[in-house]
């Protein structure tokens, strides 16, 4: 059976792995998931990631980050989903926790943070909020 929302599955796997303090989490890989992982790494929410290929199936291995025994990612939630897509112009992209968190946005120029999308003046689909 195919998965209806692979990005929500990735976010849930990260959330669940952090609740049990796992060091790494494996997620089925795709271009969008790799781009989201790159944004999370650039913003300091994860230690790193790598793509592993095993028996023709590529897996995204994400190294989770903790500070003082607590997960760095306090909240990660899906915004736009297959049943209800959420698109915003560059002026309407929301700030997460007054700029302390990030909204991950997919634009015609790729996946980026809300701050970068506002700075470049382009809008897109709001994938998730991370704080």
Curated annotation (Swiss-Prot):
PROSITE patterns xref list: RIBOSOMAL_S8 (PS00053)
GO molecular function, one term: structural constituent of ribosome
Keywords from the named record: Ribonucleoprotein, Ribosomal protein, RNA-binding, rRNA-binding
Cysteines paired by S-S bonds: none
Annotated Pfam families: Ribosomal_S8
Keyword Zinc: no
GO biological process: one example: translation
Description of how the protein assembles with itself and partners: Part of the 30S ribosomal subunit. Contacts proteins S5 and S12.
Functional summary from the UniProt entry: One of the primary rRNA binding proteins, it binds directly to 16S rRNA central domain where it helps coordinate assembly of the platform of the 30S subunit.
Protein name as it appears in the record: Small ribosomal subunit protein uS8
Species assigned in the record: Polaromonas sp. (strain JS666 / ATCC BAA-500)
The encoding gene: rpsH
